[in-house]
């Protein structure tokens, strides 16, 4: 295998990867072995048709696509190592030559880690944040806990109201025809959650158990299912049950049940302590974000588009994993929200860009400050992770590959860089706009 590197504009590069003809022949045979059981030829049993016969009937390129995929999977990682390019995106690949008896050649366009020229990062000024907790905040959290500890009861003496959960059967129609994904039975729908499109939920308010109603809505103009986008729809809905929350009394008994303390007064003190800790944690993160953003604003880097696109895709994948834990597929989420995958990627793009910029400047600070990650640092992080997973640290370390260890090492270095920045920040009370502008020009 040989690899040639061509540097392109805006921190992009093109790798041209050439694989020996012998390796292509092996991949073609692997593709044949994979596909032969699905190919039928008169006079031969399935799986027994000679490769030459299949190529004669369907053309010499019948196995090219599978063979190309096999070879790219086998060779890409090695080609990246051989190139020495610090790649920070998924590749855009193109096969430029595939022919029996000839070398297999393909290209991969990739983003290259951009160089970072740091601005001022020591002595950055951040806004001081008040972390005190008021009595009103304690009361609001108490009310929140009452809602969490509420019983769900079936309501029979009144119609659907805001905040209720209506258990419904529904079926949707466009132009009188039922559409795919528009039917459900005994679906619990919280009124006011805006889970369903348009004014669907509003039209159930005031209806009683057993009512069969027609709900008229319009799908958003930009909707995942293009055949439904912008169209009016009618849903036939039956209300099977109305459920409401019954809140517990705010007394010592509630405090005992909710928090295991003796009195409501003790519970309030515990809530105040927890809220204070939460505020302090949030304040720390907010000040870190402010400091890092100021460093980003004063630094220079040219982010390749492919790097941002890869980060957007990663964040959408992470989101899909999170909603899957609640039993919702990405397809269902997109249908309910009226969004497309591209719109979701556009939505996360600003955060994706900030994540990349933060990572790049912090890695550069770690490099310029000669921040070291010791074996003890790694052991401590493994210990923390093992505790979170309920595993033995040694076992977890055995499962970790080189890539995971390298990623952990990078994360620890970034954390140390953040600590260094925050150890040297200057705090100031929130200033007026004029003072803010003057302070900004100084940094």
Swiss-Prot record:
Cited Pfam families: FKBP_C, Trigger_C, Trigger_N
Domain PPIase FKBP-type per the UniProt entry, residue ranges: 163-248
Keyword Chaperone: yes
Protein's UniProt keywords contain Secreted: no
Function (record text): Involved in protein export. Acts as a chaperone by maintaining the newly synthesized protein in an open conformation. Functions as a peptidyl-prolyl cis-trans isomerase.
Gene Ontology biological process terms in this record: 'de novo' cotranslational protein folding; cell division; chaperone-mediated protein folding; protein transport; protein unfolding
EC class of the enzyme, as a word: isomerase
HAMAP family to which the protein is assigned, alphabetical: Trigger_factor_Tig
NCBIfam families: tig (TIGR00115)
Alphabetical list of PANTHER family matching this protein: TRIGGER FACTOR CHAPERONE AND PEPTIDYL-PROLYL CIS/TRANS ISOMERASE, TRIGGER FACTOR-LIKE PROTEIN TIG, CHLOROPLASTIC
Domain of life: Bacteria
Gene: tig
Location within or outside the cell: Cytoplasm
UniProt-listed Enzyme Commission number(s): 5.2.1.8
InterPro entries found in the cross-reference section: PPIase_dom_sf, PPIase_FKBP_dom, Trig_fac, Trigger_fac_C, Trigger_fac_C_sf, Trigger_fac_ribosome-bd_bac, Trigger_fac_ribosome-bd_sf, Trigger_fact/SurA_dom_sf
Protein name: Trigger factor
Keywords of the record: Cell cycle, Cell division, Chaperone, Cytoplasm, Isomerase, Rotamase
Endpoints of the signal sequence: none
Main location: cytoplasm
Family: Belongs to the FKBP-type PPIase family. Tig subfamily.
Comment field on protein domains: Consists of 3 domains; the N-terminus binds the ribosome, the middle domain has PPIase activity, while the C-terminus has intrinsic chaperone activity on its own.
Single annotated GO MF: ribosome binding
A cellular component annotation (GO) from this entry: cytoplasm
Record's catalysed reaction(s): [protein]-peptidylproline (omega=180) = [protein]-peptidylproline (omega=0)
PROSITE patterns for this protein: FKBP_PPIASE (PS50059)
